[in-house]
Amino acid sequence: MSRWRVFARCRREFVFHYLSARGGWDPEMPEVLQDIYRYKHFYPIDLHVLDIIKSSFFRASGKYWHGRQDEYRRSFLRFAKSDAAVLVRELAGLACIRDPYGIRSVLEIENEGMDFDTAAAEIYARTEKAALLFIENYGNLFCEHTPLDWIGTQNIISFSCEDVTIYLPRGAAWIKNGRAGWLDIGLYGADTASAPGSEEWRRYWLFRKYGVEPGRADIAFYDIFSGESFTRNIMDFDFTGAKEIMFRQAVIMREWVREAVQTGFDIMETKPEEGTDCRKCRFRNFCRKMEA
């Protein structure tokens, strides 16, 4: 649960990201909330590139590529380069890097002082590298499946399982000959074997919805920059135990928020968990500003 991971890592980030300015942009809201809203829209270059690779993937998913591997590879690379160019044009069109209306700005410009031209060059270079790696590793994926094999996972999916709503992030999922596959495209680093196993049960229950038996569903965690992937077979899962853990986490977060509101304590008095790398946090400069 990403919200729980943020809560455990840093209470400040939890409050800023999930609780402050959550109603969207309002020019009448206090200046401090306007700042928080702006900072929420800073994303590192790697996340921008991840979005581009996923977008290119889904743009290709509606076409029939069987027997046309070379054409698919050319199209995928063209999609990726086109999306990178669109992103750079959008960023260049901002009146300033901290425009309040939410084109996701570049974190390195804010935190590291990177100039815009360098950021744009990095977006292009990393996109091309990631696209070529993906083509090398999964270039035949669409050529092995027809559009009818794919499960619609271009957008976040939610569905009910018992009394719990399950949310699935975007990913590529397919069912063919009674087996299910899921390609989780992400930023896992070279050690993809350490990819979060806690995510598996979400996919498993989706596959169960489509009648796939335990042991006949595989999930591959793929890192877009190293080109490494790690595949797990999704067996049956103790959903009741997972649900209890999720509920306990929700109670802990809710009680902490309630106590914080009642006592009116200053969130800036809290400190990140030891070992947290604040250099990668979108709110780093905001914290510095508040601590000054």
What is each of the regions a protein language model found here?
Residues 19-33, 77-111, 175-179, 215-227:
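Short, compositionally biased low-complexity segments
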Residues 4-93:
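Nuclease catalytic cores
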Residues 206-292:
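Metal-dependent nuclease catalytic regions and adjoining charged, substrate-binding loops involved
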Residues 122-136, 196-204, 243-250:
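Well-ordered, non-membrane alpha-helical segments in soluble/globular domains
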Residues 35-42, 182-189, 267:
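Glycine- and acidic
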Residues 52-147:
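A non-catalytic, helix-rich entry segment at domain boundaries
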Residues 147-246:
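Mg2+/Mn2+-dependent nuclease catalytic core
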